[in-house]
């Protein structure tokens, strides 16, 4: 893929962030998601690529746009798989919380796992602890391994996990081990990425969340030199049947190369609300400001991009709830 595609994808996540940010704290997650999705779809039409959505807003009969199988781009350029989450953390934005993002991952055609929309058990770490974690090992063993890799005591390790009833046992084990815990209400893509940046204070991600988000996280962590390991967790016979039809082995531990093959991949995200990693959208008069992250796996280059947007010249993004 052309390296210039990186900045084209930032334009897409910026548009989705600007369009949805007006809904912050207004309690209307569906409207916010619709705004992000529509803006993202519009800008995709200008991107020089021949893209196919492999992870999106649902099947063709479930979503009006950015559905699985939809063609994206202007029809020129590389043939790529596209994974999108137009608004990672709809509940976060609706309540005015932290870490809402707009997210895209693009990779060579046929290299992204077409993850079904179901739960995935996950464990993720940054570069210092790659090769140390085991998704089937006890919590305490993983904590000790990460502590050793990062030259810390277990009591100094910070684990992040979605604050869900299904995670009560893991949270109890983390507390019993003496680790520090950062509970997150939504948005485990941000939680996974945070493990790769020292200033976020996060060392390891535990727990289950969406499988599509696991693939998005894998692209980011591959580019950052980190690691995520997953295992599909179907919750019904229907989901089990769907996995079998897709040829997915439910007993298989999914490692980085299973989630995203090779290193010709790009990850882009823009903050919608403030978070540990990215500042959220700010508005002042006719100007909107954004902070984005774009990472290219092939080169390992990480860029933080500050954007200042004249909303007078982007009337389609001026949304008044």
Curated annotation (Swiss-Prot):
InterPro entries per the record?
Answer: FBPase_class-2/SBPase
Domain of life per record? Bacteria
Q: Which residues bind Mn(2+) 2?
A: 85, 88, 213
Record-annotated membrane-spanning stretches: none
A GO molecular function assigned to this protein is: fructose 1,6-bisphosphate 1-phosphatase activity
Tell me the CDD domains matching this sequence.
FBPase_glpX (cd01516)
Which amino acid positions bind substrate, per UniProt?
A: 88-90, 119, 164-166, 186-188, 210
GO cellular component annotations, sorted alphabetically? cytoplasm
EC? 3.1.3.11
Q: Which cofactor does it need?
A: Mn(2+)
Where in or outside the cell it occurs: the entry states:
Cytoplasm
Q: By what name is this protein known?
A: Fructose-1,6-bisphosphatase class 2
Function per UniProt: Catalyzes the hydrolysis of fructose 1,6-bisphosphate to fructose 6-phosphate. Can functionally substitute for the FBPase class 3 (Fbp) of B.subtilis.
State whether keyword Cytoplasm applies.
Answer: yes
Binding of Mn(2+) 1, residues: 33, 57
User: What does the entry report regarding how activity is regulated?
Assistant: Inhibited by phosphoenolpyruvate (PEP).
